[in-house]
Amino acid sequence: MTYNPRDHYFRKAKQENFAARSVFKLEEIDQKFKMFKPGQVVLDLGASPGSWSQYASKMAGEKGRVLGVDLSPVTVKLKNAVFIQADLRDLNLEDIFKEHGFVPPFDIVMSDMAPKTTGIRMTDQARSMELCELALDVARRFLKKDGHFVCKLFHSDDFGKLRDEMKKTFAKVEAVKPDSTRKISKEIFLVGLSKK
């Protein structure tokens, strides 16, 4: 199969005014697990270019809020969202929450963070795992009881360890590769449902 950057999902995202095709991965995950509800407060890690935040914003509605964090700027404008351009590892999240009027815990913590790839599979997988572990740590600290967590990672031999680690925190853990994920992609999504 030939790689086509402007595939069906790319065109659909443009038609529906989403910042990126990745929105459909989150939408598929939500359709399967019914995580999003009106009025929720959502923390989006790795928010750029903004499509996951757009989806969360739409689902949370006027009474919900979204806080997005990314190294890269997020240019989408959403009435119920705030975006911080920074390295998550350098932030004092409590200060950021207070500064922007967010009071944890969050209903959903989601991470579409990805490392800058090197082309060296093991290096890229290890960096992806580190980012997912960072996101899991944030979820453990700031996600409410019965809240949900979604994290993208590049599949590797350490995948099972991370899934087992998540099982300590969540009532149910599922691995998902949405149909909208490119066939050649090694990314997979771990979903933690109902934080203990």
UniProtKB/Swiss-Prot annotation:
GO terms for molecular function: rRNA (uridine-2'-O-)-methyltransferase activity. GO terms for cellular component: cytoplasm. InterPro entries: RNA_methyltr_RlmE (IPR050082), RNA_MeTrfase_FtsJ_dom (IPR002877), rRNA-MeTfrase_E (IPR015507), SAM-dependent_MTases_sf (IPR029063). The active site is at 152 (proton acceptor). Its main location: cytoplasm. CDD domains: AdoMet_MTases. S-adenosyl-L-methionine binds at residues 50, 52, 70, 87, 112. It catalyses: uridine(2552) in 23S rRNA + S-adenosyl-L-methionine = 2'-O-methyluridine(2552) in 23S rRNA + S-adenosyl-L-homocysteine + H(+). It is found in: Cytoplasm. The keyword Transferase applies. Keywords: Cytoplasm, Methyltransferase, rRNA processing, S-adenosyl-L-methionine, Transferase. The keyword Cell division does not apply. Its EC number is 2.1.1.166. Signal peptide: none annotated. Specifically methylates the uridine in position 2552 of 23S rRNA at the 2'-O position of the ribose in the fully assembled 50S ribosomal subunit. HAMAP family: RNA_methyltr_E. Belongs to the class I-like SAM-binding methyltransferase superfamily. RNA methyltransferase RlmE family. PANTHER family: RIBOSOMAL RNA METHYLTRANSFERASE, RRNA METHYLTRANSFERASE 2, MITOCHONDRIAL. This is Ribosomal RNA large subunit methyltransferase E. It comes from Bdellovibrio bacteriovorus (strain ATCC 15356 / DSM 50701 / NCIMB 9529 / HD100). The lineage of its organism: Bacteria, Pseudomonadati, Bdellovibrionota, Bdellovibrionia, Bdellovibrionales.
